Amino acid sequence: MKLAITGATGFVGRHLLNLAVAKGHAVRALARRPQDDIDGVEWIEGAIDPAGNLDALVAGADAVIHVAGAINARDRAGFAACNIDGTAAIVTAAQDAGVKRFVHVSSLA
């Protein structure tokens, strides 16, 4: 299965990424900064926002697993920009690309 993963550089996302690769899935993962090469992973430089290269992340994906989220922000607007607007942007990109499966993981209550 071709998976697109956000938040793959965080604690939960990194474990998910490693498990997906170990299970033989092809993974495309979003990262704000360059990452070390990992066999089976294509890194897409971008961010969780409407201009964040999300179309490239989700193109051809069978499923999107959205793990990215702000757990520390300077203010309420900072949380909203990532956790609300960013989530809406990745959902829209996935819908526009015809992705049939979308999993949203969130650790904030």
List where the protein language model places each region.
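Short, contiguous strand/loop micro-motifs
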Residues: 2-4, 77-78
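Generic leucine side-chain signal with a strong bias for well-ordered alpha-helical environments
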Residues: 3, 16-19, 30, 54, ...
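N-terminal Rossmann NAD(P)H-binding glycine-rich loop of SDR-like oxidoreductase domains
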Residues: 3-25
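SDR active-site strand-loop-helix element
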Residues: 6, 30, 64-68, 102-108
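Conserved glycine-rich Rossmann-like NAD(P)H-binding loop of the short-chain dehydrogenase/reductase
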Residues: 25-32
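NAD(P)H-binding glycine-rich loop region in Rossmannoid oxidoreductase-like domains
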Residues: 35-36, 41, 45-89, 93, ...
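A short helix->loop->beta-strand "cap" motif at the edges of active sites that frequently abuts
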Residues: 96-101
